[in-house]
């Protein structure tokens, strides 16, 4: 007789094992209709799983975060069902739940076209309207293998052979005649899967290896209600308008061409933004007492073998050779910084030594993964490495956390997610070292009152790391900052310092990046601001324009004042209507347009208009410059008011 305690404190006693769905029905018909799964003693279970003993139960609906993930998992399997209806010859590989959606990779000779995706979506709706129950069965590993072998699902057989213990039970989910394996949970009935949209297809490879079979990936999104789906699709349209590749072209910021895939040609205005970011970060480096250095782009392969990068990271490293020597084009800056540290004998009094570099790095990313500024092969890291004693680690991490948050808040990012990535299976260093490194990071985050999640097994091969992920105005996640402890690399490269007892000790090395890749961060900013950069970042901050030729000399005089004040300004003396000029510079997202007519000359002032169409009225030039300099110097996000 299991006694079930519901979240609200209600206790229910049953004479026999009971499922969450049956309990929901007992509570109310509405609860039964909305029950998609449950937390049983804080563990996610299917709504149809039987509860055998006294338990705590929290019923999950499609409105909950966990419920949405379950709904999307079920929609993904509904997609599989529809694929097999339309193309029985398709071979199913793996499907995954991703942020706000799902995807399934399939092996199908027929290349999917837009009309095929429309047909798939229609088939999914037809199947969902049948309101069939989704059936869960546990079978032995051997039984599962026989089922998939009989169905010709060679990839499922491979997954069973390579990834699943032969002594475990395998959960199979039946969507009518379509069967797939999954950890679950799934919705109890297909009626939960009505509010979805198939979005796009792409090419991928079995096990992410381009030497394996080419697959087609189908992406979709799914939501609990039709209104949620419509709102999400509407936000996607807005995101599409903000595509950094499109705006980058409109504003003439940069380009990428075939002859240099994943490498950026910065144009004048784009390079201004790049340099402003560098200047901002440099100001932080000075405040936090960093030394700036520059290390070579190419270093002999033997050094990368010594560091462990070659054995752990070789597929991402570009190489070149000269005079019978093989060189690696650096994918990261850390080995070079250790070489600089090693050029002198350092005392404990010299520590912490904070070494920063805007390092130009190259990584051999697959061509199919390249995406504008967001995924490139050549990028600039705002990289730093701190050499310190074990006793100094927590203070240094504290300082880095403070600096990161100051930088992110300057750009207007308030929602910051933090993950602590722990030791991967393939790593260097012993477990004792990893235990200490992970504990130091966790303790510092806790002491700072920062909520974080563990990302188990996602650390670098040489140390655990804290990852800072920014949520933009569309709640898209951008992982930018990292703070990473490394007790191994300094030892491998024979770095040491002399302690107060005149002994040689290996320093702790902290890897730190704030923006990460400057190229990628500019892409993020373009989309976050829709090209409306804060004035301090805007390539052109002010445009001066005349109404007629009578004001040309006055405009030129005012331009000289702006130049003297180090404000990035341009003049527009073209013989065009003033409305035309205003529209053109508004489209260029110039923060301030200064209009000069006869009235302005008479009063010795200028009329100021913002790119948002706001007329600020007339200002004396010196007064405007003073306000503008304050806005720029304080890196304000807001503009001058009347």
From Swiss-Prot:
Where is it localised?
Answer: Cytoplasm
- Residue span, TGS domain: 1-61
Q: Which InterPro entries match?
A: aa-tRNA-synt_IIb (IPR002314), aa-tRNA-synth_II (IPR006195), aa-tRNA-synth_II/BPL/LPL (IPR045864), Anticodon-bd (IPR004154), Anticodon-bd_dom_sf (IPR036621), Beta-grasp_dom_sf (IPR012675), TGS (IPR004095), TGS-like (IPR012676)
Q: Under the GO molecular function aspect, what terms does this record hold?
A: ATP binding; metal ion binding; threonine-tRNA ligase activity; tRNA binding
Tell me its cofactors.
Answer: Zn(2+)
Q: Cite the cofactor comment.
A: Binds 1 zinc ion per subunit.
**Positions annotated to bind Zn(2+):** 334, 385, 511
Q: What is its EC number?
A: 6.1.1.3
| The entry's keywords | Aminoacyl-tRNA synthetase, ATP-binding, Cytoplasm, Ligase, Metal-binding, Nucleotide-binding, Protein biosynthesis, RNA-binding, tRNA-binding, Zinc
Gene Ontology cellular component annotations, sorted alphabetically? cytosol
GO BP terms: namely: threonyl-tRNA aminoacylation
Q: Which reaction does it catalyse?
A: tRNA(Thr) + L-threonine + ATP = L-threonyl-tRNA(Thr) + AMP + diphosphate + H(+)
> Which Pfam family is one of those matched by this entry?
HGTP_anticodon
Region: Catalytic, residue numbers: 243-534
Q: Which family does it belong to?
A: Belongs to the class-II aminoacyl-tRNA synthetase family.
Known role? Catalyzes the attachment of threonine to tRNA(Thr) in a two-step reaction: L-threonine is first activated by ATP to form Thr-AMP and then transferred to the acceptor end of tRNA(Thr). Also edits incorrectly charged L-seryl-tRNA(Thr).
Subunit comment: Homodimer.
Mind telling me what this protein is named? Threonine--tRNA ligase
Per the UniProt record, the source organism is Baumannia cicadellinicola subsp. Homalodisca coagulata
Encoding gene (name): thrS
């Amino acid at each position: 007789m299991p006694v079930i305690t519901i979240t609200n404190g209600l206790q229910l006693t049953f004479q026999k094992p009971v499922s969450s769905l049956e309990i929901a029905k007992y509570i109310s018909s509405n609860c039964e209709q909305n029950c998609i799964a449950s937390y049983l003693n804080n563990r996610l279970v299917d709504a149809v799983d039987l509860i055998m003993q006294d338990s705590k139960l929290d019923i999950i609906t499609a409105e909950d975060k966990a419920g949405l993930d379950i709904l999307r998992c079920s929609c993904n399997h509904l997609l599989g069902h529809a694929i097999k209806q339309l193309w029985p010859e398709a071979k199913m590989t793996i499907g995954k739940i991703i942020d706000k959606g799902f995807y399934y990779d399939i092996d199908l000779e027929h290349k999917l076209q837009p009309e095929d995706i429309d047909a798939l979506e229609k088939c999914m709706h037809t199947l969902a309207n049948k309101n069939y129950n989704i059936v869960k069965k546990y079978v032995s590993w051997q039984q599962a293998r026989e089922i998939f072998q009989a169905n010709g699902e060679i990839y499922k057989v491979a997954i069973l052979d390579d990834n699943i213990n032969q002594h475990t039970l395998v959960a199979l989910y039946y969507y009518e005649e379509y069967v797939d394996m999954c950890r679950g949970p799934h919705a109890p009935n297909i009626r939960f899967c009505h509010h979805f949209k198939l979005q796009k297809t792409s090419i991928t490879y079995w096990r992410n290896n381009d030497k394996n079979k080419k697959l087609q990936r189908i992406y979709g999104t799914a939501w609990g209600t039709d209104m949620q789906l419509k709102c999400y699709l509407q936000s996607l349209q807005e995101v599409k308008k903000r595509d950094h590749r499109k705006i980058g072209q409109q504003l003439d910021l940069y380009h990428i061409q075939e002859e240099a895939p994943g490498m950026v040609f910065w144009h004048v205005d784009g390079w201004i933004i790049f340099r402003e970011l560098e200047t901002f970060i440099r100001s932080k480096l000075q405040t936090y007492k960093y030394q700036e250095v520059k290390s070579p782009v190419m270093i002999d392969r033997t050094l990368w073998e010594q560091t462990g990068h070659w054995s752990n990271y070789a597929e991402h490293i570009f190489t070149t050779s000269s005079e019978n020597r093989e060189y690696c084009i650096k994918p990261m800056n850390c080995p070079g910084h250790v070489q600089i540290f090693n050029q002198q004998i350092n005392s404990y009094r010299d520590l912490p030594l904070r070494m920063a570099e805007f390092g130009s790095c190259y990584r051999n990313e697959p061509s199919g993964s390249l995406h504008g500024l967001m995924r490139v092969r050549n990028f600039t890291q705002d990289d730093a490495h701190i050499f310190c004693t074990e006793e100094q680690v927590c203070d240094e991490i504290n300082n880095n956390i403070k600096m990161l948050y100051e930088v992110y808040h300057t750009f207007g990012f308030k929602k910051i997610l933090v993950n602590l990535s722990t030791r991967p299976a393939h790593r260097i260093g012993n477990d004792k070292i990893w235990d200490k490194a992970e504990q130091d990071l966790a303790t510092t985050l806790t002491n700072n009152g920062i909520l974080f999640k563990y990302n188990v097994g996602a650390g670098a091969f040489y140390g655990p790391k804290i990852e800072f992920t920014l949520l933009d105005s569309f709640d898209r996640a951008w992982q930018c900052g990292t703070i990473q402890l490394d007790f191994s690399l300094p030892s491998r490269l024979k770095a040491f310092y002399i302690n107060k007892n005149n002994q040689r000790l290996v320093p702790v090395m902290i890897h730190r990046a704030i923006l990460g890749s400057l190229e990628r961060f500019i892409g993020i900013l373009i989309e976050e601001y829709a090209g409306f950069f804060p004035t301090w970042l805007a390539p052109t901050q002010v445009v001066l324009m005349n109404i007629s030729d009578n004001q040309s000399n006055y405009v030129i005089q005012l331009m000289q004042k702006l130049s003297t004040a180090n404000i990035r300004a341009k003049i527009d003396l073209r013989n065009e209507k003033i409305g035309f000029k205003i529209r053109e510079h508004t489209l260029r997202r110039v923060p301030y347009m200064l209009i000069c007519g006869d009235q302005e000359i008479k009063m010795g002032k200028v009329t100021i208009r913002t790119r948002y169409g706001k007329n600020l009225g007339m200002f004396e030039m010196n007064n405007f410059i003073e306000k503008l300099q304050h806005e720029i110097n304080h890196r304000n996000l807001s503009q001058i008011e009347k």
